[in-house]
Curated annotation (Swiss-Prot):
NCBIfam families with a match to the protein in the record: pyrC_dimer
Pfam families referenced in this protein's UniProt entry, alphabetically: Amidohydro_1
Domain of life: Bacteria
Family in the record: Belongs to the metallo-dependent hydrolases superfamily. DHOase family. Class II DHOase subfamily.
Purpose of the protein: Catalyzes the reversible cyclization of carbamoyl aspartate to dihydroorotate.
Cofactor note: Binds 2 Zn(2+) ions per subunit.
Protein name (Swiss-Prot/TrEMBL): Dihydroorotase
Length: 343
């Protein structure tokens, strides 16, 4: 097969950032995705309906001329989030709330310290038909960074899913066989997003033969056995797993430093890279479900009607992109060949 046409996909997890960065990031995503779930970890974070609506307006203003792209807005849970905050968010059209354990990733310092205190908020999300999106890692310093996803499942995820049985939960950017197995065995209303980097790479690609900061993300890349579990589950076509790039831009100097930031800026190549993975797996027939159907169905949103076509054609991801402020950013897979291209 040298050409594949699918329903236009959506990205169910990404980071746009803010201000002039939006002129770069929104265009990159809008080129091939109709909708995207926008993470709220700005500085300060998007914690209220009012802040979410303001952020949405800034995103819409950054769309390329003629674009029909629509952001799906979220709010950021903190220890101070109230049931009223959830009700206000629902009225404002916000579809989901994102839970970051405090300190788990970029701009998560305002995140949750006392998860137990948030159960009334989780109940309010369920009562209002909103989703809970979870960065599923513990943050205790004594727990090895490669084990933090599994520990979160054992310490928290099982309880959340069991104690609020009518709450829709998305286990974001899963990276381990443990997470795959958990989601497969979980009740209805539990799903997961998977990034291109966790399908394409393992920790050797970040650490073997030199440190590659542009492959550094959180949750961190894991060993190859976990990568293979992710690849196998997307190959299976399970509707519990769908596309979420976690595209996360940082200027080059913030990645290439003595304390580099976590995140892969994949928006310019993500759809093509997912296609390459499904091609490698002999499962191109499963791409449309993963990219275009399962996420919309899980969120209770209509499937897109427009279509996109990808062709088997090699191209090279640029080594650098210039941001609107003049600074360079290194895109994910920079300087490498991709075997599929958006038509």
């Amino acid at each position: 097969m040298n050409e594949i046409t699918i329903i236009k996909p959506d990205d169910w997890h990404l980071h746009f950032r803010d201000q002039d960065m939006l002129l770069e990031t929104v265009a990159a995503t809008a080129r091939c995705f109709e909708r995207a779930v926008v993470m709220p970890n700005l500085v300060p974070p998007v914690t209220t309906a009012e802040l979410a609506l303001s952020y949405k307006e800034r995103i819409l203003a950054a769309r390329p001329a003629g674009s029909t792209f629509m952001p799906v807005m979220t709010i950021y849970l903190t220890d101070k989030t109230s049931v009223q905050d959830i009700q206000d968010a629902k009225k404002a059209g916000v579809l989901a709330a994102k839970m970051y354990p405090a300190g788990a990733t970029t701009n998560s310092d305002s995140g949750v310290n006392s998860l137990e205190s948030l159960y009334p908020v989780f109940e309010a999300l369920a009562d209002n038909g909103m989703l809970l999106l979870i960065h599923g890692e513990v943050t205790q310093k004594h727990i090895d960074i490669f084990d933090r996803e599994k520990e979160f499942i054992d310490q928290h995820m099982v309880n959340i899913v069991d104690r609020v049985p009518n709450l829709k939960v998305v286990f974001e950017h899963i990276t381990t066989k443990d997470a795959v197995d958990f989601v497969l065995a979980a009740r209805d209303g539990v799903a997961a997003t998977i990034t291109p980097q966790h399908l394409l790479l393992n920790r050797n690609d970040m650490l073997d033969g030199g440190v590659r900061p542009h492959n550094y993300c959180l949750p961190v890349l894991k060993r190859s056995t976990h990568q293979q579990a992710l690849r196998e589950v997307v190959k299976s076509g399970s509707p519990k797993f769908f596309l979420g790039t976690d595209s996360a831009p940082h200027a080059k100097h913030r990645k290439e430093s003595d304390c580099g930031c976590a995140g892969c800026y994949s928006a310019w190549s993500a759809l093509e890279l997912y296609t390459q993975v499904f091609d490698e797996l002999g499962a191109l027939d499963k791409l449309e479900g993963f990219a275009s159907l399962y996420g919309a169905d899980f969120y209770g949103l209509p499937r897109n009607t427009e279509k996109v076509t990808l062709v088997r054609e090699s191209w090279e991801v640029p080594n650098s992109i210039t941001l609107p402020n003049g600074e360079p950013i290194v895109p994910f897979f920079a300087g490498k060949q991709i075997s599929w291209k958006l038509k």
